Every structure is written in C-alpha cells, then in structure tokens.
C-alpha cells in the first residue's frame, strides 16, 4: 500500500480522500478560468520526470505547478536505467519536495515510492493513469453533484485508462463496465496481478459486444 502522501493508484486511497481531492479540483478549475489560482505550491520544489513518451499531461503538470507558484525542474532520469531506484530516491529526497513521474512500469514506480520519503505522484504508467481519470470524475461530479450510483461504460481495450477506471470502481461507490469487440483481446480481469485486493463486484470487465 502506498503512503497517504503518494498518489500512485486510485484504490490506494479511501473514498472520502478522493472525493475531497475532486471537490478541491473543481474549485481550482474555476480559479484557473478566472486566472486567480491560489499559490498553494509557493516555494515548493517539484521534480517532473518523463520516463515515457508523451507531452500533454506532463506539459499540463508543469504549467499547473508554475501557475500555483512552484519551482518545476525536469529531471532526465529513468527508473529502468543503470542507477538503482534507491539511489535515485536519495537524490530526489535531497533536492526536491515532490516528484511527479510518467514511467512505463507501475511496479518500478511503487519501488521508488517505497524508497523515497518525498511524495510521489503518478503522471501515467502503462497500467494506470489515475490523474486522467480524476479529471474525468471531477467533471462528472461538478455536473452531477455526487458520484453515488454512477455507472460508467468504458468502450476500450485493456489499457491504462481502463485500469484507472477499475481502480475508481474499487475505491468509490460507482460501477464500471468494460464493453469491447471480441476481436480485441482478453479483459483486464484475466490478469490477476493487475487487480487490487480491493476489487469486487463494482468492476465488471470483459462485457463483449459484437453487433
């Protein structure tokens, strides 16, 4: 289980914690539109690590950190490189207050979080994409007023977005149903290693539709 200060997967956290984050995100979205974002990261040193391709969410992180008053530095490191994860964690602890990292392997990211004392935030792995799903949930919460009884249909093959929606179903009072053509590939639930012990009937993966 991740530390409460880490944000690695949605189902590492309690429902009330996630709902508090979502409501705060709605407030920050309004502040962004009004160009009056609180300086909540004033003086905070943030390492942004892009250990996997892509530019949109890491650019959004960098912009958000700077708009909130933080100092953002892109650290060109790789969790799969020659340096031991424990050694990287020590350097990050010495230099930064928070690390935001986009990396392929969730297992490696968890090892970094275990070795480091600073908070580790998952910007994306190939198994999950919790901040992306949080953004979607914040929009739904703003429009709907609550998440109770929410049923989400995910028309997608196995991937990190589906993985995070499955995490959301385990943590919140929502149901997630995967719908996909049989020609795609086996549902995520067949890979038990990717499922949290918290997963239950709230997540139905593998509903096929070949119409």
Language model: regions and residue ranges:
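Hydrophobic beta-strand scaffold positions of dinucleotide-using enzymes
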Residues: 21, 99, 210-211
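Structural motif corresponding to alpha-helix initiation and N-cap regions
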Residues: 34, 82-86, 199
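Phosphate/diphosphate ligand-binding glycine-rich loop within oxidoreductases
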Residues: 39-141
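Glycine-rich phosphate/diphosphate-binding loop of Rossmann-like nucleotide-binding domains
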Residues: 50-63, 143-211
């Amino acid at each position: 289980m991740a530390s409460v200060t880490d944000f690695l997967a949605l189902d590492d956290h309690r429902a009330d914690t996630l709902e508090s984050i979502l409501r705060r995100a709605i407030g920050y979205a309004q502040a962004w539109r009004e160009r009056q974002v609180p300086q909540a990261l004033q003086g905070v040193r943030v390492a942004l690590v892009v250990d996997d391709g892509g530019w949109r969410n890491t650019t959004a992180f960098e912009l958000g950190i700077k708009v909130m008053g933080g100092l953002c530095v892109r650290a060109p490191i790789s969790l799969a490189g020659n340096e031991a994860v424990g050694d990287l964690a020590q350097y990050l602890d010495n230099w930064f207050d928070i690390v935001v990292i986009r990396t392929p392997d969730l297992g490696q990211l968890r090892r970094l979080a275990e070795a480091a004392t600073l908070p580790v935030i998952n910007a994306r792995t190939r198994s999950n994409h919790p901040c992306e799903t949080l953004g979607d949930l914040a929009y739904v919460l703003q429009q709907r007023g609550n998440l109770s009884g929410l049923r989400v249909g995910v028309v997608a093959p196995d991937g990190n977005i589906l993985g995070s929606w499955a995490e959301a179903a385990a943590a919140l009072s929502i149901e997630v149903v995967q719908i996909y053509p049989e020609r795609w590939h086996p549902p995520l639930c067949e890979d038990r290693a990717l499922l949290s012990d918290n997963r239950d009937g709230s997540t139905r993966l593998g509903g096929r539709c070949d119409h």
